[in-house]
């Protein structure tokens, strides 16, 4: 065996190993190796492909980052039509569905399979000789859009099939499924967008659909998409299944992720499954809007066939919506720190899902036009789980006779500067360089917990400082005197002293916090950390080329251009120099080489008395550790403060080492 043959054999072995570890981590949430071990395997494969370029195949795990942007999506004709399910909304509909099935099949009772109905985007995937070669959206059911490059970026989707139990992989296999975003990932995505000054997504489905249909796969790669598969198209080499459950287990054996399911005997069994699903819907890690009910027996399915574009053998039993109707009292425009003009509906307060809702974002002009929300309208408002409230629909029959469409402003409502659309045409921004509304939001961000952490500098104080003209730039904050502060509303001696002390403390900061505090568009906390590691001093960014910035971890071409433009702008350079001259001293990141936290995954839970959660996170990261948001078998330590909840319980179940606050502080001191 020559060198190339050895390299090819090792590459195939690495494909299999990495696919196995991806499945354990992204599907089962039960990893067998550490991040460092996984990265070592990936680097070995990358090195092999660099030495032997012909080994870099489209299904290689190294190709998940996404290729070049496309001008438009190609069309894909589906091998078999992608049909959609009919909906039912009450028990009567379920009873009628079961009666029809029993009558057509001629049996007194039917076995069903019940699955959570994901609120995602339907897809078709094609594998040839076990390698993923094409993926498409449903489209009109006959023809969909080719989104292969974007689907390659989804970590839970295997690029190659490595079956268990010596199952033979068909030469051609087409499977159907759904792309979605998990709740925790959606929450993190919106938090990141908020950090970066970008408009929030309304719900996980919108985020998933928008992410999958990005023309630039690198944008999709930055979004935390997941996938479940639930169907495969009959073909040569594909087993003939007796039941749907048998089919699901076959997909699972091939290494494809499947949703949870439950077998139900007859109508009463489905009712019990529905009641259990409805009761436990908020416990699931993803949003569901109902339960899919399918006949389990494959022969019965063939006999039942389909009507129009829906199968007779399946139905979507929708959950009652968590929606309430209320009145739109007004529509206003909110100006963000990056100048984005966001329409906001001010509502007559109403309780939705146990929470009082008085405002709902309308996201942007296109969304406002699509829904045609107007002042005085009666609307339905939905709030699902942790998702921000959104207006679902307008009750047109109750629309006032004198209502008029909302006129989106051509100028900023605060500074009257011209408002222009972004390159993608979705967001309208104020162009005013000295817009007071932007300045207020920028100061709020500058003082926020992850930035300079200036305690006592909140929304109202920021607005007062700007409106009185005392603060026109960040550096002006450090020139404030106690006498200046005492002239402001609701500011006494003690409050003024505390704020001055907080401002003084904030001067001793980190480069990561400092870069994040500047409010650069697209730059959240994680990107600020990566930039700080690459450029320990801000002045280095003044001299950095676009290529230098593009080499920073997780910085894509669009973000790199924005960052480069920001630091080339003389006004921004002047603002940074003014802050440094005012005494702000951003410390360069320290790289830990030893100690109990190096390379460890730590989860923080509960309230701590000796420091804030953010301070604890910084201390762990400064010592070479990584703070994760959830507990898994990969977690090395869980630091449990007061009133620790589900994370502590999971750590106990998994046998993860648990530290109380005192033990954690002692570990920090021994590794100071």
From Swiss-Prot:
The active site is at residue 117. Signal peptide: none annotated. The keyword Metal-binding applies. It holds the Pfam family DNA_ligase_aden. GO terms for cellular component: cytosol. Keywords: DNA damage, DNA repair, DNA replication, Ligase, Magnesium, Manganese, Metal-binding, NAD, Zinc. GO terms for molecular function: DNA binding; DNA ligase (NAD+) activity; metal ion binding. InterPro entries: BRCT_dom (IPR001357), BRCT_dom_sf (IPR036420), DisA/LigA_HHH (IPR041663), DNA_ligase (IPR001679), DNA_ligase_AS (IPR018239), DNA_ligase_CS (IPR033136), DNAligase_adenylation (IPR013839), DNAligase_N (IPR013840). One of its GO terms (biological process) is DNA replication. It is an enzyme of class 6 (ligase). Residues 592-672 form the BRCT domain. SUPFAM superfamilies: BRCT domain, DNA ligase/mRNA capping enzyme, catalytic domain, Nucleic acid-binding proteins, RuvA domain 2-like. Belongs to the NAD-dependent DNA ligase family. LigA subfamily. This is DNA ligase.
């Amino acid at each position: 065996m020559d060198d190339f043959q050895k390299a090819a054999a090792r590459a195939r072995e690495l494909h299999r190993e990495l696919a196995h570890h991806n499945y354990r981590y992204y599907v089962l949430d039960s990893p067998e190796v550490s991040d460092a071990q996984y990265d070592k395997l990936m680097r070995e494969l990358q090195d092999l492909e660099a030495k032997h370029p012909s080994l870099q195949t489209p299904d290689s795990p190294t190709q998940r980052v996404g290729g070049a942007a496309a001008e438009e999506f190609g069309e894909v004709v589906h091998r078999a039509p992608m049909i959609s399910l009919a909906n039912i909304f009450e028990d009567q509909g379920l009873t009628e569905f079961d009666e029809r099935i029993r009558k057509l099949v001629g049996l007194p009772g039917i076995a069903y399979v019940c699955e959570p109905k994901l609120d995602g985007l339907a897809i078709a995937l094609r594998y040839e000789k076990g390698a993923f070669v094409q993926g498409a959206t449903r489209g009109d059911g006959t023809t969909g859009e080719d989104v292969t490059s974007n689907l390659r970026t989804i970590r839970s989707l295997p690029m190659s099939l490595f079956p268990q139990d010596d199952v033979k992989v068909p030469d051609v296999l087409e499977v159907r499924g759904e792309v979605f975003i998990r709740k925790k990932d959606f929450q993190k995505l919106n938090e990141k967008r908020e950090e970066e000054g970008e408009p929030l997504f309304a719900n996980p489905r919108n985020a998933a659909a928008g992410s999958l249909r990005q023309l630039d796969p690198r944008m999709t790669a930055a979004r935390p998409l997941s996938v479940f598969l639930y169907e495969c198209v009959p073909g040569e080499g594909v087993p003939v299944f007796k039941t749907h459950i048998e089919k699901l287990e076959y997909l699972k054996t091939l290494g494809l992720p499947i949703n949870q399911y439950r077998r139900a005997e007859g109508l009463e069994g489905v009712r019990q499954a529905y009641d259990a699903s409805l009761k436990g819907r908020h416990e699931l890690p993803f949003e569901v809007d109902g339960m899919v009910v399918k006949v389990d027996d494959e022969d019965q399915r063939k006999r039942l066939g389909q009507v129009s574009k829906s199968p007779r053998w399946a139905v979507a039993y929708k959950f009652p919506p968590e929606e309430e109707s209320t009145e739109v009292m007004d529509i206003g425009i909110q100006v963000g720190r990056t100048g984005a003009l966001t329409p906001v509906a001010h509502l007559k307060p109403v309780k939705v899902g146990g929470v009082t809702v008085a405002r709902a974002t309308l996201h942007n002009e296109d969304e406002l036009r699509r829904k045609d929300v107007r002042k005085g309208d009666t609307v339905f408002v939905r709030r699902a789980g942790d998702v921000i409230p959104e207006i679902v629909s307008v009750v047109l029959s109750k629309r006032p006779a004198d209502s008029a469409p909302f006129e989106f402003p051509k100028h900023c409502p605060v500074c009257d500067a011209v408002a222009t659309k972004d390159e993608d045409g979705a967001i309208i921004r104020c162009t005013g360089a000295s817009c007071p509304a932007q300045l207020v939001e920028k100061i709020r961000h500058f003082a926020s917990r992850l930035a300079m952490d200036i305690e006592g500098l909140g929304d109202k104080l920021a607005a007062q400082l700007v409106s009185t003209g005392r603060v026109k730039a960040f550096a002006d904050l450090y020139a404030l005197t106690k006498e200046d502060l005492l002239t402001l509303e609701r500011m006494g001696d003690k409050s003024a002293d505390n704020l001055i002390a907080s401002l003084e403390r904030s001067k001793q900061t980190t480069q990561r916090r400092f870069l994040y505090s500047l409010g650069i568009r697209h730059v959240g906390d994680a990107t600020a950390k990566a930039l700080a590691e690459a450029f320990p001093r801000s002045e280095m960014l003044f001299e950095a080329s676009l290529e230098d910035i593009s080499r920073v971890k997780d910085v894509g071409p669009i973000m790199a251009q924005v960052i480069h433009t920001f630091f080339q702008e003389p006004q921004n350079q002047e603002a940074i120099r003014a802050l440094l001259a005012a005494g702000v001293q951003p410390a360069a990141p320290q790289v830990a080489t030893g100690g109990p936290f190096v390379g460890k995954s730590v989860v923080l839970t509960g309230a701590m008395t000796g420091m804030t959660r953010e301070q604890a996170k910084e201390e762990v990261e400064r010592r070479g550790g990584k703070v994760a948001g959830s507990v898994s078998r990969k977690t090395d330590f869980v630091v449990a403060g007061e009133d620790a909840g589900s994370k502590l319980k999971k750590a106990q179940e998994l046998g993860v080492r648990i530290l109380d606050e005192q033990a954690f502080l002692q570990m920090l001191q021994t590794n100071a």
